[in-house]
A protein has these predicted regions:
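Compact beta-sheet-dominated domain cores in extracellular/mature segments
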Residues: 2-13, 18-135
Length: 135
């Protein structure tokens, strides 16, 4: 009886291990893929060139680079996608959510053309229609 119970427990554990391995991975920031809930910032127009993808608001782009490159994203963004279905994404010209702004509604994308190309230094999400805390 003890042996049968031991085999049953081992079988259940094996099945649990298989299902755990089949669970989808969570999105990872800056993995080079624009996943649900992320801000995806692109080096070039039309969502091309290097990509920086993140699940977090950033008060400063200083030191951040496009995935797989050494190119910093500060003042080098030409297009973006807001993959968060619920919150607006706000881009700021300066660090600490200051300066000119560009609001990107939940679930939308944009090209930063003309004077707004290569301008952004921080971003945050908010459910509000105007800006970030302290911005």
């Amino acid at each position: 009886m003890k042996r049968a119970r031991g085999l049953a427990v081992a079988s259940v554990m094996s099945v649990a291990a298989v299902f755990a391995a089949m669970t989808p991975a969570q999105a990872a920031s800056n993995d080079g893929t624009c996943n649900t809930d992320e801000a995806c910032i692109y080096r070039l127009l039309d969502y091309s060139g290097g990509i920086y993808d993140t699940l977090s608001s950033k008060k400063s782009y200083s030191g951040l680079v496009f995935h797989g490159t050494s190119t910093t994203i500060d003042n080098k963004a030409s297009s973006a996608r807001n993959k968060d279905p619920d919150n607006n994404l706000w881009f700021y010209q300066l660090n600490n959510w200051a300066g000119d702004t560009w609001g990107l509604p939940a679930g939308s994308s944009t090209n930063f053309n003309g004077p707004d190309d290569n301008k952004w230094s921080s971003h945050c999400w908010t459910g509000a229609t105007a800006g970030c805390p302290g911005g």
